[in-house]
Structures are given as structure tokens and as C-alpha cells.
């Protein structure tokens, strides 16, 4: 599965992306502090999606992004949705890799050209934290070296927050995947044809409010609520 332009070849990472079933819209921030969420609640801060940052709707200091969040909070889903949205735009060509199936990824495996058939390549590498020890260090060295050699290339990585490596990824802008807000949970409940006010009252009555911050658990709660 290869695409070429002017003799430049993409060796690996091309796939036909699909929309994520039951996707819940997520937002990212470059500010990990509590103040960021407070400003949003007060209506003083706009929220931005990962695609906003990648495509330049929201400016960043670099064209390379590493997305951090805790384990099992939706990073892989977010990158899959990003690839789908980029593909659907017709302007971008997402080239994606999952580290768990590419533990020995080398820079020679990665795209050589910024554009293919008029579309801008976006290199997406999911779950750097799937490997550890020397394999992790080797992977970071390959990715960091590739980023240095290709300043023009848009790149998006994902990684658990406790695996942060500022020095090896100094060319990357750090973004953090936000937890779902109460309004996000309400909106998704309504989308699932649930009375959002009653659902939220049930959540708080049963002290389950921490679970609605995570898309997976929110979906499970709504399934349980609908089946009660």
C-alpha cells in the first residue's frame, strides 16, 4: 500500500481510516494547570480540538505535537478520530503507526516527502509508552532524529503523562487531553437520547461524578442507565 509523488515513496503506515463509532468530542490544552479549566467554566477560554492544533486553526510554536494524558483515557481513540478527520478533509494524508505493533520503528520506515498527490502528510505515532526500557529510549532517538531531519513534517505522538521526556522531544509542543466536563457529559447523554438532567441527577446521587470525566466510563454509565 504505497503512494508516490516525484519519486518519493511512503513505505508504511497508509491505511483507510474510519470514523470512530460513538466518538465523544474531546479537547486539548497546552496548559495543564487547574486555572485552564476554571477559565473555560467562566467562559473566558475557548476550547480547541487536536485537529485545530494540527491544522493550524489554533497556533502552536511548532508543527510537531505530543499528546499526553493518563492511561486508558482515550488517546488512541483521539488519534484515530484525528486521522479520520484529516483524511476526510482531502487536504491531508495521515500516515499512522501503533507502537505496540511497531516496537522497532526506524526513521527509514517514515515518510520522506511533505506532500503526496497534493496532500500534506501528517505522521501520527500512537502510544509511545507501549514499550519501555532500552526499546523506549531507542524509539525516542529514532523519532527525535527524524523530527530534527524533517522540520517541515507535521507530526503527532501520544504518550502517557508519566512517560514524559522533554529533552528527547524538545522539538514537540506538549498538549494535554482534557477530561470531559459536566457539560460534555450532558451533551453526550442527550445525543444518546437520554434525559440529561435526570441522568446527571442519578450520577451525583450515586457519587459517580468522577466516572463521567472518562469517555469509556461515561458510555458504560449511559448504557446502564438506559437499561435500568
Language-model regions: role of each:
Residues 4-228:
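P-loop NTPase signaling cores
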Amino acid at each position: 500500500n504505497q503512494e508516490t509523488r516525484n519519486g518519493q515513496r511512503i513505505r508504511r503506515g497508509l491505511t483507510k481510516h474510519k470514523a470512530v463509532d460513538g466518538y465523544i468530542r474531546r479537547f486539548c490544552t497546552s496548559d495543564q494547570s487547574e486555572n485552564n479549566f476554571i477559565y473555560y467554566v467562566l467562559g473566558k477560554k475557548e476550547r480547541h480540538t487536536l485537529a485545530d492544533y494540527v491544522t493550524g486553526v489554533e497556533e502552536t510554536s511548532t508543527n510537531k505535537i505530543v499528546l499526553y494524558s493518563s492511561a486508558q483515557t482515550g488517546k488512541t481513540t483521539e488519534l484515530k478520530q484525528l486521522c479520520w478527520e484529516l483524511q476526510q478533509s482531502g487536504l491531508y494524508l495521515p500516515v499512522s503507526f501503533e507502537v505496540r505493533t511497531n516496537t522497532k520503528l526506524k526513521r527509514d520506515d517514515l515518510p520522506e516527502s511533505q506532500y503526496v498527490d497534493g496532500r500534506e502528510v501528517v505522521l501520527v505515532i500512537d502510544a509511545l509508552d507501549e514499550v519501555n526500557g532500552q526499546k523506549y529510549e531507542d524509539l525516542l532517538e529514532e523519532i527525535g532524529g527524524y523530527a530534527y531531519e524533517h522540520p517541515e513534517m507535521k507530526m503527532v505522538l501520544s504518550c502517557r503523562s508519566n512517560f514524559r521526556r522533554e529533552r528527547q522531544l524538545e522539538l514537540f509542543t506538549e498538549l494535554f487531553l482534557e477530561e470531559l466536563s459536566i457539560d460534555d457529559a450532558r451533551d453526550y447523554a442527550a445525543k444518546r437520547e437520554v434525559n440529561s438532567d435526570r441522568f446527571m441527577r442519578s450520577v451525583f446521587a450515586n457519587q459517580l461524578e468522577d466516572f463521567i470525566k472518562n469517555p469509556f466510563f461515561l458510555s458504560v454509565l449511559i448504557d446502564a442507565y438506559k437499561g435500568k
